[in-house]
Amino acid sequence: GYIAHILQYARGGHLLPVTDLVKQHSWGQMGAWKYQGENWFYPYDYNLVTCYYRKDLYAEKGLKIPNTWAEYLENCRALTVSKDGNIERGGCVMPLASDSATNWASFGNLFAEAPQFYDDKWNVVLDAPENADRAGRFLDLYGELYKTMPPGLNTVGYAELMSLFVTGKVAHTLYSGRVVEALEARNPDLADKYGIFAAPDSTGKQKALPFAFDGFVAFKTKQSEETLKFLKWFIDEHYIDWLHSAWMNSQPVRLDIYEDPRWKKHP
């Protein structure tokens, strides 16, 4: 669930604080957050959204990794293959649904443009002229990118974002590291033909990686004490094994993991 779901449970008194476990380690940016002075969530990864692209197709067309919105759009257009007016290979695929895939993966180019959504008092300021202009131009970009997508896609969720790239139906997609696992398992011929890049802004000044956290919560039950004991045992003994179970998808948010020999020895 989202942070709002966790906060609802915390405010309702249904969660056990995990502050004593969280404070034992250093965390990446925005990794460990508190509500009412306590940690209610033990993170284990960033779900970073990167843009996957076909390196072999880039080489064929002499394309470079884009540094601006315009360059990204031109690359998508250049790699779109049409026959008799129909798109046979899309230049890209993007989320198109009122769901968590859209919330998670769509907005890298907008975040790179750095509009302000709220002021320091949580008032909505996205409609201020400068912010509205950035958001409007992003929507225009999205509309142009849509024209390079395979036809007939009225909704696009997690499944399509992965499957269309893995099967070679599109040249770009937005996803986390699970794409790599899917390529190696389902289409190994493409497993050495992909690359990744961060979402650029419109002027080439900066890039962004949208992300979402995964982690653990502990609910209050008749076995609350045992629940926390189990969580501590799991963190001490199997936390890294858990991360290795989806090694490309689970980018650790706990900073000490990157120096841990158990993490490094993964083949």
Model region roles, listed by residue range:
Residues 35-44, 49, 73-125, 170:
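Extracytoplasmic/periplasmic solute-binding protein
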Residues 1, 171-176:
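Paired acidic/hydrophobic, glycine-rich loop segments that form the ligand-binding mouth/hinge
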Residues 76-78, 123-155:
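Glycine-centered hinge/linker elements that transmit conformational signals in sensory
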Residues 62-64, 143-157, 169, 187-193:
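A local structural motif
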Residues 2-50, 64, 103, 113, ...:
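Hinge/lid segment of periplasmic solute-binding proteins
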Residues 69-74, 153-167:
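Short helix-initiation/N-cap motifs at beta->coil->alpha
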Residues 16-28, 84, 96-99, 115-137, ...:
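Short, solvent-exposed loop/beta-turn-alpha elements that line the ligand-binding surface or hinge
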Residues 178-190, 202-267:
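C-terminal lobe and pocket-closing loops
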